[in-house]
């Protein structure tokens, strides 16, 4: 986890000039096992790639860092064809299909638009042994806390598509009509009333499906204008992952 080092760098840079903004630079993830370049020797899949991209973008957004996702298409080297692309290409330099990571980036960019800003890490409690990141989402215009982005951060993203239902208490959050957004498919799910209730300055979610990729709890009114939602409730299973 490079986050502590990045935060230390941001603090150092701000001590010289707070106007300087950090940039993530060339960062990306393969979609298959690679024998060269970054993140090699690990059996990546197109789904674990999408999870990695979503986590990287969410973490950068939480810290106020501009993201650069490497790369848009698969690069062709003299000795190999890379798999880092959001678009799968062939040796004829033709686009074959859009990877799940392509849709993930679309959904992240569409949701985390300029009207919303990071509220940083939120204090939380949960009944899971997994380590979580919980970052607040607030409106730019008035600083109202309108949601949170949550993911398991203690392991390399896997290609397992199962969610873990947990109990989660988030400090300072109070939502009237929350929805749950899965950032790879972009699907928006209704959260029934028993899933979330507020009290003692925090909000509790019961049976909340989380995994090693960001899910977003958001006030319905904070969705992008024109977003169509359905009253389908998330099942917390692989059925939720089908495009």
Where do the PLM segments sit?
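C-terminal beta-strand-rich structural cap/linker in extracellular carbohydrate-active enzymes
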Residues: 192-243
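Beta-sheet entry/capping signal
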Residues: 20-22, 66-68, 147
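Solvent-exposed beta-hairpin/edge-strand motifs
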Residues: 169-189
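Active-site neighborhood of glycoside hydrolase catalytic domains
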Residues: 1-24, 30, 50-57, 63
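Carbohydrate-binding surface patches
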Residues: 124-175, 214, 218-223
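Well-ordered, non-membrane alpha-helical segments in soluble/globular domains
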Residues: 2-9, 45-54, 101-102, 162-168
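Aromatic/acidic polysaccharide-binding cleft in carbohydrate-active enzymes
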Residues: 28-112, 116-131, 144
